[in-house]
Curated annotation (Swiss-Prot):
Receptor for cysteinyl leukotrienes. The response is mediated via a G-protein that activates a phosphatidylinositol-calcium second messenger system. It is found in: Cell membrane. The gene is Cysltr2. This is Cysteinyl leukotriene receptor 2. PANTHER family: G-PROTEIN COUPLED RECEPTORS FAMILY 1 PROFILE DOMAIN-CONTAINING PROTEIN, PURINOCEPTOR-RELATED G-PROTEIN COUPLED RECEPTOR.
Length: 309
């Protein structure tokens, strides 16, 4: 669903989008790569250090970090493609995998964040009734279901690879021959991949606020659990609003208002910017681990203390 690409005939028109992509994408992708690789790579290391003491929350966070790290590893290839002026040199299957990885990461991230918020809320509002749902074993099963569902539903992207034009090889570009199918896929992804999880996340936010206002709990343990639940949902909401909402909104507008005879440079540039915001979700998730992870700060202190000995 590479809706941020440009049709191959754009280079024959007086459009500025290609120059914008060449100047904008490489530097932003490389910044996201460095920041995201360090943050998620170190987070994975921290989660694995005390895996035997893991909780369901950390299982979801570990899978989220793995998804981000796998996607981050593809960004240098995207940066190279745009730096060369939209010329792909890494082969057809690599092109397919690059497009596929973007959407697998985006929607696994959305679902992991949503499930994290649900688990945090249930553990706070119904701690004893929901023990079987919030167990580590249940968390791994649910993570497996999410991975299989997202990877299978994104499988159509593996059908579309590189395209030869003159002396260049295009990748990530709109396929006008299958434009109607692309619009349909966008609406499905918008509904199932974004609006439904966002609705669930909003409900969790309202319910946890209700729980916090309903009764004052003096004990430090329950209070800490409620604080972490609220922190998880608030950070997830910020990531949704900052990274995923602009991209899904602009992607839909871009497809609905598509005009083959117009450059639509301003709209296209805005869509390009929102794609990098969506990719940047991988940089923000480590903040979630630090502020809302189970014993994440304590593990960090233990690791650094061990290094100084």
């Amino acid at each position: 669903m590479g809706v941020t690409g440009t049709p191959s005939y754009y280079s024959d028109k007086n459009c500025t989008i290609e120059n914008f992509k060449r100047d904008f994408y490489p530097i932003i992708y490389l910044i996201i790569f460095v920041w995201g690789a360090l943050g998620n790579g170190f987070s994975i290391y921290v989660f694995l250090q005390t895996y035997k003491k893991s909780t369901s929350v950390n299982v979801f966070m570990l899978n989220l970090a793995i998804s981000d790290f796998l996607f981050i590893s593809t960004l240098p290839f995207r940066a190279d493609y745009n730096f060369r002026g939209s010329d792909w040199i890494f082969g057809d299957w690599a092109c397919r995998i690059m497009s596929y990885s973007l959407y697998v990461n985006m929607y696994t991230s959305i679902y992991f964040l949503t499930v994290l918020s649900i688990v945090r809320f249930l553990a706070t509002a119904h701690p004893f009734q929901m023990l079987h749902i919030t167990s580590v074993r249940s968390a791994w099963i649910l993570c497996g279901i999410i991975w299989v569902f997202i990877m299978a539903s994104s499988g159509l992207l593996l059908k579309h690879g590189q395209e030869k034009k003159n002396n260049t090889t295009l990748c990530f570009e709109l396929n006008l021959q299958k434009f109607k199918n692309l619009v349909i896929l966008n609406y499905i992804a918008l509904g199932v991949g974004f609006l439904l999880p966002f609705f669930i996340l909003t409900i969790c936010y309202l319910l946890i606020i209700r729980v916090l206002l309903k009764v004052e709990i003096p004990e430090s343990g329950p209070r800490d659990a409620q604080r972490k639940a609220l922190t998880t949902i608030v950070i997830a909401m910020i990531i949704f609003l900052l990274c995923f909402l602009p991209y899904h909104a602009l992607r839909t507008i871009h497809l609905v208002t598509w005009d083959a005879d117009s450059c639509m440079d301003e709209l296209h540039k805005a869509t390009v910017i929102t794609l990098t915001l969506a990719a940047a979700n991988s940089c923000f998730n480590p903040f979630l681990y630090y502020f809302a992870g189970e014993n994440f700060k304590a593990r960090l202190r233990a690791i650094f203390s061990k290094d100084h000995l």
